[in-house]
Each structure stands twice: as C-alpha cells, then as structure tokens.
Amino acid sequence: ITVGVKDTGVKSGIIGEIGNFWPTNETSRKILRASAHASVETGAAISIHPGGHPDALLQHLNDLIEAGADPARIIMGHLDVFPYSPEVVKEIAETGATLEFDRFGSENTNFAEGGHDIAFPSDVQRIERIEQLIEWGYESQIVVAQDVCLKTDLVSHGGGGYIHILDSIIPRMRKRGFSTENIDNILIENPKRILTFT
C-alpha cells in the first residue's frame, strides 16, 4: 500500500479481500486485527469476504472495529451470496459499513458452504434488496460488482461478463424507478468515497 509492488510504482488501493469463515477462528481474527491496523495506518479501506452465516457479519465487523478500524472504511462483501435476511443486512448498514452486492450475473449458480447447498439470489432479488436499503436511507453505503472470478462468469462461457451491470442491471434499475442520482451514487460516488484514502 505504501511501498508498491517491487519497482513498478503500482500500489494497492485496498486491503483485501480478506477471506473469513464461520465459525471464525483465532487466525482469522488475527488477520482482521492486522487489517484494521493497516487501515488506520494507511487510510485504505478494507474489503471483507464474510463467513457464510448471519452471525459472521457482525463478528467480523466487531473484530475490525475493536482493533481500531473505522466502520466507514469497511466494505462487507458478498451480501447477495449467502442467504442473509434484510434485518441482518440492515444491522450491518447501521454500523456505517459499505454494503457490497457483488455477484450480479450469477443467477443460475449455487455452491456448497458448510455442508449446505446455497443457491444465489436472482438479479431481480438483488435489485429489490438494494431498493429496500435505499428506502431505509442507506443509499450512500451501497456498491455493486460482478465478482467475475470463475470461467463461467465470462461471456465466452455463458456468463454476463464484465459489462453485465452496465448493459443489463442499470436498464432494469431505471425501469423500476431508480433515479439517475441513485445510480450515480451506487456506481460512482460511493466507490469513489470508499476507494479514496483518508
């Protein structure tokens, strides 16, 4: 973050994605504490991959906050992957953390976590959750992404690819009544805020 990658001049702009599991263990908690210390020292935001249980979200946040991290510098990712209730996501929002919905385009995907099959929500369900959060007053904390991380996420292999949000999701949001301001905040202003070092 401060030195860069060898002599390239390229520096990391974010701490993470910090992977976590549930139940958490002392090694994971130590990594979270180190991430918090690095964020305080550098001003970089922290991106969290939470464990797949509702209790994991607040546990990870509490570990970071207790170690000194500013909740406004924490991005809680994959809020649209695991079956978190609206109430749990609202609890995260109330801390001031950024809410990341990052698996747009993965509607027909499922995987196993902790011995349970998890079916991802549809893009419509993701949009509905974001709409609900905006109604609750959390628009300034929402970011979206596609987390293109599997071959099947690529257009050449049947996925939505890197353009899915702009080509498919934004038009759907507009049809549902999202304003230009809503969309600009989610796509531009909120990422700009969280990615700017403090």
Whereabouts are the PLM-identified features?
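Structural preference for beta-strand elements that scaffold enzyme active sites
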Residues: 12-14, 45-47, 73-75, 96-100, ...
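Short acidic/histidine-rich active-site segments
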Residues: 47, 101-103, 138-159, 183
